[in-house]
Amino acid sequence: MATPTPTVKIGFIGPAFNNAFTLDSATNGRLDNTDYVLGGTEILVDLTSRTTSLRVKRGRKDFTQPFRTGTATLILRNIDGELDPLNTSSIYYPGVTVGRTVTIDCNGQSIYNGTITNIELGYTVNGDAWVVVRAADGLGDLATREITDGTAFTAQKSGERVTAVLTNAGVNFQGTSAINAGLSDLAAETLSSATNARSYLRKVINSEQGYLYGNRSGVLTFENRYGPLADTNKATFSDDGSDIAYQRIDRRVATTELFNQLSANRTSQDPVLVNNTSSQDSYGIRNLNLGEVLVLDNSTVTDLLDLMLVKTASTETRIAEITAVLDTLSGSDITAIAQLELVDKVTVEFTPPGTSQQIAASSIESIEHNFSFGTTWRCTLGLIPQIVTSYLVLDNATLGQLDNNSLGF
C-alpha cells in the first residue's frame, strides 16, 4: 500500500510575489530576462501544508444532461491569519482572491485546474480560523459570457462552431482548449440577440451528441460522438485482487433515466419524434425533449434521437458508481486513478451475490475526489455502460451485439 500525496497550489499577486517588469529596477528591470514580465503574472504558491480537506467534482450524474462545471472546494487552516486580506504584514497580502488559479495534484498527477469563484473566512473565539476556497473550471467561465448580438455563423462542423463561439468578441475565452473538428454539419445562422455562451454551446453538443468539459488539467475539451468508441481501456477495477481494487459498487435501474419517446427541433421548426414502441408497451410513453438542435435537416435530427434512444430506452441494471480508497492501493494504482479523465473507458469486474463474476466495459461520466488529512482519500467514478455510448462494431464482443448499439452516421 502507498499513501496518496496531495499538492495544492493557489495563484497570488502581491508585493511578495511581484514579477512585473519595472523600469530603473536593478532586479525587476533587467532586459532580456524571462522572470519579470510586463504587467506581472500570478505566481502559484504551494499551500498543501495549510490544506485540511479537499473535494473535487467533475462530470455529470445524469447522462441525458450536459457535463456540469467542474468544481473544487478547499478548506485551509488560517490560525496565524496569514491568509486574511486585512493582514498587511502577511507574505500573502492581499490574500486569497477570486479569479486566481487553483491546481490540485495527487501523487504528482493533476486532478483539477480551475479559478477561484468564492472565498469564505471564518474563525472561532477560541482561536481557530480557516478559509474555504471554492473554484470552477472553464465551463463556469463560459456561463458568464455572452455571444454578441448579430453574430453570424457560417454553415460549419460542430467543432468549428465551438471554436467560433470561444473566439467571439463577447466571449474571448482565454483558457487553453482542445477542440475536435466534430462530425455534425450545423446550419448557418445569425443571432438576433446576445446569447449566453454556455447555453448556446449546449445546443452545439446536442447537435453532435458529443462532449464538452474542462479536463483535469484545465483544458476546455470538445470530443465528437465517436469519443468513447475510439478510446482504449484506461484501467481495470476488480473485486478479486487481480487489478485495481474498489471498496464499493452501486448498480441501479431508475425511471428517471428511462425515456422511450424523444423529441428535438431544428431552429424555428416543428419537433421531430422517435419512439421505442416495445419499451412504451411495457412502461407507457416517457418523453424527453432534447430541445433545439442546429443541424441541417430533419433526417439528421432523427439520427441523433435514435442514437440517444439506445441509451434511454434500456431498463437493464447498470453500474452507476464505483468507489476506491486510494490509501489501500499501490502507488501505480493510485497514479492510474489520478490520471483518469471524463469519457475514458474502464473495465469493471464484479461478483454480485449468488452469481459468477461479471465484466462490464464502461465510460466515465463523473469523477469525484474526497480527502481530509488524517482520513482516507476516496475516489468515486460515475459510469455508464460503453455498450450504450458507442456505435455497432462488427466482430466486437462488447460493441457488436445486435439490438444494443446504433449504426453510425
Each model region followed by its residue ranges:
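Assembly/oligomerization scaffold segments
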Residues: 1-154, 188-194, 198-209, 243-247, ...
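Hydrophobic, Leu/Ile/Phe/Ala-enriched alpha-helical segments that form helix-helix packing faces
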Residues: 10, 106, 165-170, 205-208, ...
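Short, cationic low-complexity segments
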Residues: 23, 102-103, 153-167, 288, ...
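An acidic/polar, Gly/Ser/Thr-rich interaction patch typically located in mid-to-C-terminal regions
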Residues: 59-89, 179-228, 234-409
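Short, surface-exposed linear patches
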Residues: 96-97, 125, 136-140, 154-159, ...
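Alpha-helical structural motif
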Residues: 127, 131, 158-161, 260, ...
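N-terminal export/assembly leaders
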Residues: 143, 162-192
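Charged/polar, solvent-exposed surface patches and flexible loops
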Residues: 160-168, 303-310
